[in-house]
């Protein structure tokens, strides 16, 4: 299944079989809890349409996205669609009209949801957004129960779930455990007042690997995003045996001999110490190759790591071909993935950038062709 065009210099191949296996392993690790597949930011840059369709076929409990526009991109999928990010006022009607599960962040928002749903002749299906320590969006878990009980009395509000989020689940620390306790306290008040929520979730990918307390009752579901693709946060445990789903490949655009003393690329950051065989790779930072590869990283050609020479350009990257003198224009270049005995991972790039894999995935450029294969 193709996510984009079938032709392009830079190709992102996502293995459907590995994606399915990762999903099944995640499901098995948290059973009997259900799994919500988080596919925000165009499935972390990998192409939401095809990936969402595959995961729905595999039985995901829901697909979660960050905003209304992302939900509309999958509106026809036969599954529960959850928006995690707070709605802007002018997005409310479309979200409710399409039956999306939407986040409820404060009482004033509940009043708006109720009025819109009443006008539309339907219910607003709400997941309470509970701030237990992220200080981002939602009801303050320390002072919210009276407002939540007021929300429950609004005739066109249906409270179907409640979720929260960890700022540091990869540590599995006391702060994260305290967040779980806060959630449980609010849940207990709701249940004591006859409010039973079908969707109760706090665990993200980091929590699945580091916080078993977030992956059992009273919670009903977990949310997973980056683990689906076989990637993990740089910090924390990797409890699940997941495999990378993607490769990024391009081709050599030109092979040339560059004389000793010549400089390579913008800023003249590399000077050839001798006559050198140099390859011009048809991919650059516009395609997602980090600038941090400049004079530090390598790409794989014919199974051989080829050091990046000079600064990564927008459209091209120059590499040394001294270890692959038979390389020619058109040869495959592996940016992420395996070639021969060597491999380069998303985590390798994240380490070079001093960032996390999420940023690396989301930085893959729009002109790179995504293919679910």
Where on the chain are the PLM-derived regions?
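Active-site anion/phosphate-binding pocket segments in diverse small-molecule metabolic enzymes
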Residues: 2-20, 69, 87-89, 106-112, ...
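Active-site-proximal beta-alpha core segment in soluble small-molecule metabolic enzymes
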Residues: 6, 10-14, 18-20, 31-201, ...
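Alpha-helical scaffold segments that flank or form the walls of functional sites
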Residues: 22-24
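N-terminal nucleotide-binding beta1-loop-alpha1 segment
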Residues: 27
